[in-house]
Amino acid sequence: MHRVLLTSLLFFILNSGRAAEDKYSELGATYNGTICVDADTGIVLSESTADSLGHPASVTKLMTFLLILEDARDQQLNLNSLVKISKEATQIGGSQVWLAVGEEFTVKDLLYALMLQSANDSAVALALTRAPTVKEFVERMNTRAKELGMTNTHFVSPHGLTYGAGPHDTTTARDLAKLCVQLTTLKDAFTFTYCKEFNFRPGLKSVRLNNHNHLLNSYPGCDGFKTGWTVAANASIVTTARNNNHRVIAVVLGCDSPSGAKIAQRVRDQIAGKLMTKGFEKLAVYDAEKAKLLTLTHRDTPKGKGATPSAPKKSDSEEKTEEKGWLEALFTF
């Protein structure tokens, strides 16, 4: 009975009212796939062709980012340690911070360059701190992807900059969501993904970095993660926001527009914002219905002499499992 009520209420709320007028026309726009998930449980809140393959472009850097932060968490790496720049790191094109052979930067500074400027040279420099060769680091990326259940993902680079016929990094919207659910468990991640500006290499050769994720400024509560674009991959974004007690993650993979690349990037952001808004709306329904059911349960619980003893306090893992069960009951229909 409660399941029917939840389903009916959810359908009514999500289909009532008129949506705000879009700033950018989505007419003719296409994408490989989209998805929105609850970050705490991984429950899917909405999806569209989320298992279709696409090229992530610079969104690839999120796996490089994850591996570096996990190594730091496991005390295999100090974010304040210095990295000496090799020749190989200076020979990559595309977006960069123009690293020079012999320069030294902290791992932390290279992460800012990676996440704000989407610096390909920084991605190579970071990869070479954790493996003897870039190829071996990419093998680590693919191993970690399998561990996270990213079954349709294959990386060929630490940065996502590929040319012509490839090979290209390949993934799906669903797999990228799995990656970012893991990212949200790392306390240091948002230090970099929420940073809007950073002064890299202070001095005569200083580079002012500006975060490419425009939703940080336009979407309330947005604090990550990463955008990407190449001619071969089109425009992608994995983004996240927190609202009250909930965090959602939205992915738009391979967005293209007949109006050109710049509009495709704006449409990509617009779609991602809508996905997060709808996700929060669903979670608000969940909160309201859970509160109602808990109130009913509390009201019907015997009190006084002969009452059933209260249940022992649940552990964090038990509460998370219960939360996931509530969400599955609400959204699986």
Regions found by a protein language model. Give the residues of each.
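Domain-terminus/edge residues, biased toward the C-terminal soluble/receptor-binding domains
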Residues: M150-H154, A165-F333
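Active-site-adjacent loops and short helices of periplasmic peptidoglycan-processing enzymes
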Residues: A19-R174, T184-K187
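Alpha-helical structural signal
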Residues: L10, F65, L111-Y112, C180, ...
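Sec-dependent signal peptide recognition
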Residues: H2-T7
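Hydrophobic h-region of N-terminal signal peptides that target proteins for export
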Residues: S8-R18
